């Protein structure tokens, strides 16, 4: 039995989202993320080319007023224009393009941007830059054969404007689950990459999912028996997510309510954190 526990707790004076994966009453994995997220990694924007630096083969693209990112010119042919220009046209200052943040700003470096938009699901990844069909190298020969057969019609479509990568997780899924997720990712692509062409400059077209949704996405549904949270906002988001992506899983979500015993205390998350902090690794040198 695998239970997913999603809650909010204080850590070092900061409010955090905490996700615990519990098996047979024991926390096996704990993921934390600041509730006030600073990262923009994975976000997709309508950016505007500020200038082009041919000497370093890069363009500097504004994704918000005063916020610029580094865009490699070798991806210029993959650009989806929001300014009405035809695909494959030369990139010019002032052009409005769809970009995804591939690396956060760090140590004085600008955030890195890419034209290859990625939409990641539990079993599949849909991409706009590489319009090929691929499978994870970790899949066995028989798994690759089965999954290729299930997605043969989609892979053979000559008119598709995106690529598809089959993740290792897909080996655990039924055909209906794979096709249901494909439908969801295609609708997300349509909403962001197609409809985004008509959005105004600096629009945020897609925001990376918080840790509690990515954790939920990555857990195999066949092993997951219970999803519990005591945070109303998290509960609303996970039920909406399940309704859209896996309606058959929605009944597993439940809301815990006890003001005297918060969920993080009931599930002993503080103890799990203490255990992690106490762990020591003994080196050969004795340090």
Q: Residue spans of the language-model regions?
A:
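DE-rich acidic low-complexity regions and acidic surface loops
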Residues: 1-287
């Amino acid at each position: 039995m695998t239970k997913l526990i999603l809650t909010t707790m204080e850590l070092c004076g900061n409010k955090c989202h905490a996700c615990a994966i519990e098996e047979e009453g024991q926390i096996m994995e704990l993921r934390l993320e600041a509730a006030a997220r600073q990262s923009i990694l994975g976000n997709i924007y309508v950016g505007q080319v500020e200038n082009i630096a041919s000497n370093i083969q890069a363009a500097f693209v504004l994704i918000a007023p005063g916020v610029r990112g580094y865009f490699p010119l070798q991806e210029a042919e993959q650009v989806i224009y929001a300014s009405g220009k035809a695909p494959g046209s030369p990139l010019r200052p002032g052009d409005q393009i769809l970009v995804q943040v591939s690396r956060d700003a760090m140590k004085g470096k600008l955030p890195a941007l890419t034209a290859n938009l990625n939409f990641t699901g539990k079993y599949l990844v849909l991409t706009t830059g590489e319009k090929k069909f691929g499978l994870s190298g970790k899949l066995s020969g028989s798994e690759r054969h089965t999954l290729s057969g299930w997605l043969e019609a989609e892979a053979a479509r000559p008119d598709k404007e995106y690529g598809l990568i089959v993740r290792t997780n897909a080996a655990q899924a039924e055909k209906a689950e794979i096709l249901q997720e494909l439908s969801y990712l295609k609708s997300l692509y349509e909403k962001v990459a197609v409809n985004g062409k008509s959005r105004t400059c600096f629009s945020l077209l897609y925001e990376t999912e918080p840790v509690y949704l990515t954790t939920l996405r990555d857990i195999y549904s066949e092993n997951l028996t219970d999803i519990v949270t005591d945070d109303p906002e998290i509960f609303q988001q996970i039920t909406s997510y399940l309704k859209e992506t896996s309606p058959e899983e929605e009944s597993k979500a439940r809301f815990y309510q006890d003001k005297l015993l918060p969920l993080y205390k009931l599930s002993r998350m503080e103890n799990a954190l203490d255990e992690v902090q106490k762990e020591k690794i003994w080196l050969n040198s004795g340090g």
